[in-house]
């Protein structure tokens, strides 16, 4: 089996990345439907444009600010966004309804993303193992920084690019009430913020 892309669904998507001036649906929060969870400005909802068959596609709006970005968030906002995102991702994993669950963020006009407004996507794959081609070697590399269980390295076995940075932390820490886990969740967010995101593949803790 393989993921099937539905071209018909994709044809109706708003795209202000390639067509500046297009109305942003994420700015009009009153018009949003099928909201799963909300915490402050963070909104997790069903993706209106289901372009991948045999999946559950959801979107996580990070901020009410259309021009905001992970690299510009103040510490409190950054930590809130990342905790919310990791918690939503963990919820889909814990549901055991999917063979695998992916969380990712497309950034920039060449990333394939259609909307500028800061957001991530969490996708449950019903039949596919999205991690099947990954090995522990993909998360290893030249050590750059480590504090506690949070580490940053330059990958020596990049997944899809010439230059990738791995930011790793123990899986499930965001859902824990333990003070150490919460502190390291914030460290994980801090490390992602300072990484050179224009040139990296940021690896969330998946294995």
Language model segments and positions:
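Active-site microenvironments that recognize anionic phosphate/pyrophosphate groups
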Residues: 1-115, 123-202
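Short "domain-exit" segments at the C-terminal end of structured domains
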Residues: 203-207
């Amino acid at each position: 089996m393989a993921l099937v892309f539905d071209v018909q669904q994709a044809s109706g998507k708003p795209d202000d990345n390639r067509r500046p001036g297009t109305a942003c649906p994420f700015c009009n929060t009153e018009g949003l439907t099928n909201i799963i969870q909300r915490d402050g400005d963070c909104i997790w909802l069903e993706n209106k444009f289901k372009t991948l068959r045999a999946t559950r596609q959801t979107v996580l709006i990070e901020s009410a600010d259309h021009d905001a970005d992970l690299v510009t968030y103040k510490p409190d906002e950054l930590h809130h966004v990342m905790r919310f995102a990791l918690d939503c991702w963990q919820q889909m994993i814990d549901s055991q309804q999917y063979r695998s669950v992916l969380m990712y963020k497309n950034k920039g006009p060449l990333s394939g993303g259609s909307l500028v407004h800061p957001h991530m996507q969490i996708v449950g794959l019903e039949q596919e193992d999205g991690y099947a081609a990954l090995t522990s070697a993909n998360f290893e590399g030249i050590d750059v920084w480590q504090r506690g269980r949070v580490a940053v390295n330059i990958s020596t076995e990049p997944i899809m690019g010439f230059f990738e940075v791995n930011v790793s932390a123990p899986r499930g820490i965001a859902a824990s009430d333990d003070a150490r886990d919460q502190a390291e969740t914030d460290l994980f967010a801090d490390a992602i913020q300072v990484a050179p995101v224009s040139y990296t593949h940021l690896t969330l803790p998946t294995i």
